[in-house]
């Protein structure tokens, strides 16, 4: 992007994580790992049985983590959208009420995570914490195109650069995404990767 005020992190807040998060996908692809993940002394690639174990363990606890991230987004949006409803309320009560559907029911609960959840009050993520999960969905979906066309397919890489990276905030994130994927975002790839589907 030639205009710095439209590039880098100067894009829609729920689109800013897509470029960085999509890169993480290559670190889980055998074809990519074989290019750089090698033994320091022998130069051998990661043994297939070990890589298989890593892949199998990738989703350990994924459903719990998924729900935890959703709960963070939920409480963040709830408190910012309906602030007046929570003024002078006990923080533990608000936590239990708003997040009941996101937790395993327990007779004893710990202290509210709201006491330490600084993202919802500072750092630019106020009412924007959902963007982490949204970006995860976008990058998993966008990577599905790389996976289907070849993770090192030069044409797909150029298309990603042309449609997403080089455009910055010159057009809406939704338009840029549709330019690359030729459709709206679909959560299926993220749910598959997490082992939920």
List each model region and its residues.
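Cation-handling catalytic/transport regions enriched in His/Asp/Glu
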Residues: 1-197
């Amino acid at each position: 992007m030639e205009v710095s005020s439209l590039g880098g992190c100067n894009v829609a807040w729920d689109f800013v994580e897509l470029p960085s998060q999509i890169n993480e996908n290559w670190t889980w692809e055998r074809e990519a790992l074989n290019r750089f993940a090698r033994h320091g002394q022998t130069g051998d690639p990661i043994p297939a049985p070990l890589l298989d174990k890593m892949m199998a363990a990738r989703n350990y606890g994924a459903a719990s983590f998924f729900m935890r991230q959703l709960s963070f987004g939920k409480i963040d949006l709830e408190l910012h959208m309906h602030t007046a409803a929570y003024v002078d309320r006990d923080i533990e009560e608000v936590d239990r009420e708003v997040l009941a559907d996101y937790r395993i029911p327990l007779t004893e609960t710990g202290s509210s995570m709201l006491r330490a959840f600084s993202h919802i009050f500072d750092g630019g993520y106020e009412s924007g914490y959902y963007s982490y999960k949204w970006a995860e969905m976008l990058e998993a979906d966008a990577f599905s195109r790389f996976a289907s066309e070849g993770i090192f397919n030069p044409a797909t890489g150029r298309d990603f650069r042309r449609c997403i990276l080089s455009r910055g905030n010159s057009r809406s994130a939704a338009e840029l995404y549709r330019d690359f994927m030729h459709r709206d975002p679909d959560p299926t790839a993220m749910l598959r990767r997490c082992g939920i589907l």
